[in-house]
Amino acid sequence: MVLRLLWRDPFWNGKRKPFGIGILMSGIMVILLFLTMMSYMYGVLFKSGYRAHNLNILAVDYDGGIIGEALSVAYEQFHGDEFPELQFHTPAKYPSIVEVQKAVCRGDYWGAIVTQPGASNRLSQALRGGSAAGTYNSSDSLTYINNGARYPAVQLGDISGNLETLIGAVSSVYHALNGSQALSSLNASNENAVLAFLNPIKASHIDIKPTEQGTRVLFNTVSVVLPIIQQFFFLMAFNGINNQFGIYGRLNSTRIGLMRLFTSIVYTLLASLATTGYIWAFRESWNVNGGQFALLWMSYWIYMHINFLILDAATAFIPVSFLTFFVLPWAIINVAATIYPFELSPGFYRWAYALPSHEFYSLAIQVESGCGDVLYRALPILFSWEVVGLALAITGSSYRNRHAEAELIAVGKVQQSASKSDNNTLYDDERELITMNRLSPVQ
């Protein structure tokens, strides 16, 4: 029958208070940990709408007429903290729309809007009727450019959405600035001319890398944090298997270190292949090729291997009961570094340029879109993490092995001492029996 101890049982004497304090303190520590981490995470997005002006938009007036003027005046209506900042430059600096597109692709600007050459003249001729009215296309007035692969959610809401709002206002401003003159020259008997007057200005759109699949919202969130959790789960299983088979303490540290290094390389290679595979499997109509698959695979590989090394070192030095206080913050600060662009977050968060997740995601954007040269920054930072992680993992493996070896030696000494004690006891018993036999009378 199983003995069930009541709270008032003597078993609890001297244990009630420490037991209760232990549970209470653990609960408080975990609550404070999550409070701190979620405050950090929420801080990334706190009042981000009021930082939209940090998103710079290149504006170039190739028209030089009333439509270019209408664009400038319309922007003044929206100019403020909650609207991206248009930075106007002359055609001399950006001689063609191709140069504007290259500037957006390089990452110099989050987007661009330009007036098409001769747009005002084409509209003026269309209002007079004739063949010009029949061939007039209001979408040839303005063009806006963006890179849909660079933080897709931000591109959809803050860039494309705001630019389309601005473009809608340009038409109203045009009528306010030039409506009377346009009406005086309007050929009211020509249907196409009237349509040109009613809808004078629209915009064409150039998306450098359309990224419209539903899974795009996971690229800089779930697909950044899950590789960290994945390495942690595997390491817990890997360390458990090593302990079960008594590997530590019985092999020299060099062999164990090489075994763990080989395992980390092979496992992260396969894990990164699987991750890239499911991204490709759900890409829908996303226009990417095999070369980009391979480069993204390699990007995930180095990112996962860095996390493997960091967590391997952590599991070596930090007791299992306290690992939560390292793994959770490590995961949160890394995903917070990619969930939103730094332009929309408080300046404090820019320290996360140094984190592997941010450089990995920057590298992934370059691979996916072919834009934004970040290799000069991303590769040195990722390589530094790889070197530091490898050094920590080697140190941790050596520490783990020495600690296990010391435990084996201590256990051996205890067993040896117990064996000697048993032998001495047996020897004493034998001597006592012999003495008793000698003293007993012969029958």
PLM features per residue range, with description:
Residues 141, 204, 239-251:
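Hydrophobic transmembrane alpha-helix segments characteristic of membrane transport
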Residues 47-49, 82, 95, 241, ...:
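Residue-level detector of solvent-exposed, low-hydrophobicity positions
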Residues 42, 213-236, 245-428, 443:
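Membrane-spanning alpha-helical segments of multipass transporters and channels
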Residues 1-214, 410-443:
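Extracytoplasmic/periplasmic domains immediately adjacent to an N-terminal transmembrane anchor
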